[in-house]
A protein has these predicted regions:
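Portal/gating segments that form or line small-molecule/metal binding sites
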Residues: 48-114, 118, 125
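Internal alpha/beta domain cores that form substrate/cofactor-binding pockets in large enzymes
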Residues: 99-103, 107-115, 123-145, 149-184, ...
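Conserved small/polar residues in nucleotide/adenosyl-binding loops
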Residues: 205
Length: 205
């Protein structure tokens, strides 16, 4: 497929995320679906950003099926938002801090409120919408907060490129490119019901 994925179970992936958070070395995780993989074929910078990530997990049943066809099967599909939920739960339990980056103005703040209702004790140490032109002030704002976990929800390929370009400038534990997750957490976009998710039919919902 031109992109190497980490072959992990959900439990293994979450454990690795926890370790990367604890190491606090500005690691980053990407969650490519088939569309992102195809875009990486034509975009060398995106390809490098994905391949240089500390963790590459398959978010999309198409990736899992393609891997099986070419003889490099993956253990399971790992939706990025579900990994994000597990990390938020871990953060709430351990006092780790979280910064929310992305979406339209107001969405990250709404997501913060919902997250803190769902995960009591969660420390959301900062938010910033995704409508910025200059990375510098945003990087400074994030570094001032020193989050353990940075949710980067800028959409692909912007979020993958942003993490790769800024990893060395950031003082965070783990960054994760999680697409439209903030909209889901804020309640402005609904996920497909669990039954649809189990059938891998989310795109039809």
């Amino acid at each position: 497929m031109g992109v190497g994925f980490d072959d992990l179970t959900r439990e293994n992936a979450i454990d690795l995320c926890k370790r990367l958070i604890d190491e606090h070395r500005s690691a980053y995780m990407v969650t490519p679906n088939p569309e992102i993989v195809m875009a990486a074929w034509e975009n060398a910078e995106l390809h490098d950003a994905i391949c240089n990530a500390d963790l590459v997990i398959p978010d999309g049943i198409g990736v899992v099926k393609a891997a099986r066809i070419i003889g490099t099967p993956l253990k399971e599909r790992l939706p990025g938002i579900e990994i994000g939920e597990a990390i938020l739960e871990y953060a709430a339990q351990t006092g780790k801090s979280v910064f929310l980056l992305g979406a339209k103005p107001g969405v990250a703040d709404a997501a913060k409120e919902k997250m803190q209702e769902t995960y009591p004790g969660l420390n959301v140490c900062g938010t910033n919408d995704g409508y910025f032109k200059d990375d510098g002030p945003v990087v400074e704002k994030i570094n001032a907060a020193q989050p353990d976990f940075l949710m980067v929800c800028l959409g692909a390929p912007k979020q993958e490129l942003w993490m790769a370009q800024n990893a060395e400038r950031l003082d965070v534990g783990l960054m994760a490119g999680l697409g439209g997750s903030l909209d889901v957490f804020a309640g402005t976009v609904m996920r497909a019901p669990k039954a649809w998710q189990r059938m891998n039919a989310c795109l039809l919902y």
